[in-house]
């Protein structure tokens, strides 16, 4: 039987469309997804779960051979997205080697060039230790969180060694069902010293299926523990656990989701971007799509929404700037006030005025930064660049042209994904590209896909040729 995928969150319709077109089964679908796709009720256990990790990320989790394929199919379709995949599986089991001690924590090498942190550890450096991955290191710089309570994972349950507890998924809410499932699990592990976690799919399973899987996983765990006793070399991976990866949804990836959703139900432009805002904006999107179904043109709706957002931003004292980097970190720059808004056939241009508070040196420009300096930050809809134009009084200090995905202009927020490579323009008129190697590093790590990599290089070269046209001069506008 083909891979069964459980899909949840605000992207569910678009993601389901992509996966159904590729031949996957959608299992445990919500009522609205079954209705939209005319799907039969299928309560089969999920091989893979796809859900929102936050407003700008999709999480893909599940068995290897299934989840990794779903992940790759999604990033191929979304094209312009950041990719973060853990080099080790969630709940993978390792015979690790203790490399260091920091306080009451051990730093353990577990294989695949990964080191993890094992809390409450007083073992000596150089000793071997059997550990499981409780939290996988998905993004660059993250460390694996390790545990001595190792587990093997099935479709309905997980069996846990080192923690004889009985737990159940929070997604099983029916009290009688919870009591019934817990009773089944208790009868199978009583006196074994093992723990059981009942996964959400167990609510659809019969008693025999759960009991059979518990027996199979207990046997698998015994074999792993026995194997670990006879291994001489560490680190060694004993059990792969579950694949886990995140997809960073740029504005362009959200547009792709919009297009897939529109094939199923009428969808306004920027649906997924606007839906990630507050509840008020989400309700406005829902209302707008009712208008779309009643024949109001997509352009009229888009223009009206754009006007609403611009008027909202004009009325706000500050606009937040959210800058998402390829390492997965999110930086909130010091906010700005609206200095200028220009609408044209090309879209909207917003100029924010930011008064800088800190001392230092402007990156790449080699010019001293002083409190009171002004940054005129120019953001254009559909543009791959955001320029920072630094002034001290009427003196132009230089400009820093940031290359990024086209920004999302939202109520009170401007958000974009940084592509690392930038162009600096000195007050002498000299322009040069900086941080190209950093872009290349993230491309080689397969975090930035080829299309984004090539586009960033193309934009950087174009800026060099036309940089004089990109300098913002407030007194000449």
Swiss-Prot record:
The EC designation for this entry is 3.1.26.-
The UniProt similarity line reads: Belongs to the FAU-1 family.
Enzyme class (EC, first level): hydrolase
Q: What protein name applies here?
A: Probable ribonuclease FAU-1
UniProt-listed GO biological process terms: rRNA processing
Disulfide linkages recorded for this protein, renumbered to the chain, are none
Chain's role: Probable RNase involved in rRNA stability through maturation and/or degradation of precursor rRNAs. Binds to RNA in loop regions with AU-rich sequences.
Keyword entries, A-Z: Endonuclease, Hydrolase, Nuclease, RNA-binding, rRNA processing
What one GO molecular function would you report for this record? RNA endonuclease activity, producing 5'-phosphomonoesters
Q: Which Pfam families match?
A: DUF402, RNase_E_G
Q: Which gene encodes it?
A: fau-1
């Amino acid at each position: 039987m083909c891979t069964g995928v459980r899909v949840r969150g605000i992207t569910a319709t678009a993601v389901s469309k992509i996966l159904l077109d590729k031949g996957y089964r959608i299992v445990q679908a919500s009522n609205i997804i079954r209705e939209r796709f005319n799907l039969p009720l299928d309560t089969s256990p999920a091989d893979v779960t796809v859900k929102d990790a936050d407003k700008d990320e999709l999480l893909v989790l599940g068995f290897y051979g299934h989840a990794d394929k779903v992940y790759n199919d999604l990033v191929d379709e979304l094209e312009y997205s950041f990719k973060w995949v853990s080099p080790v599986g969630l709940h993978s089991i390792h015979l690790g080697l203790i490399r260091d001690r920091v306080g009451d924590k051990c730093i353990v090498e577990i294989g695949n060039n990964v080191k993890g942190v094992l809390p409450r550890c007083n073992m000596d450096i150089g000793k071997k230790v059997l550990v499981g991955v409780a939290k996988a290191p998905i993004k660059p710089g993250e460390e694996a969180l390790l545990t001595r309570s190792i587990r093997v994972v099935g479709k309905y349950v997980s069996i846990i060694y080192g923690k004889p507890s009985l737990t159940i998924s929070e997604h099983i809410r029916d009290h009688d069902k919870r009591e019934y499932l817990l009773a089944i699990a208790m009868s199978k592990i009583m006196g074994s010293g093992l723990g059981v976690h009942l996964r959400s799919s167990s609510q659809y399973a019969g008693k025999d299926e759960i009991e059979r899987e518990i027996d199979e996983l207990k046997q698998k765990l015994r074999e792993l523990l026995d194997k670990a006793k006879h291994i001489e070399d560490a680190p060694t991976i004993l059990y792969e656990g579950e694949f886990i990866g995140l997809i960073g949804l740029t504005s362009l990836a959200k547009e792709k989701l919009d297009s897939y959703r529109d094939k199923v139900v009428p969808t306004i432009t920027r649906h997924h971007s606007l839906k990630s805002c507050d509840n008020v904006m989400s309700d406005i999107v829902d209302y707008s799509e009712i208008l779309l179904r009643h024949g109001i043109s997509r352009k009229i709706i888009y223009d009206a929404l754009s006007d609403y957002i611009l008027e909202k931003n004009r009325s706000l004292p500050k606009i937040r700037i959210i800058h998402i980097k390829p390492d997965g970190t999110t930086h909130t720059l010091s906010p700005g006030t609206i200095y200028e808004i220009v609408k044209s056939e090309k879209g909207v241009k917003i100029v924010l005025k930011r008064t800088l508070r800190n001392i230092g040196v402007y990156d790449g420009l080699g010019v001293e930064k002083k409190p009171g300096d002004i940054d005129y930050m120019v953001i254009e809809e559909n543009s791959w660049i955001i320029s920072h134009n630094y002034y001290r009084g009427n003196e132009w200090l230089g400009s820093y042209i940031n290359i990024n995905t086209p920004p999302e202009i939202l109520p009170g927020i401007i958000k974009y994904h940084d592509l690392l490579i930038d162009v600096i323009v000195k007050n002498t008129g000299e322009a040069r590209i900086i941080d190209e190697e950093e872009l290349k590093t993230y491309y080689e790590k397969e975090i930035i896909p080829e299309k984004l990599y090539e586009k960033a290089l193309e934009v950087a070269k174009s800026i060099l040729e036309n940089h004089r046209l990109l300098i913002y001069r407030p007194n000449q506008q």
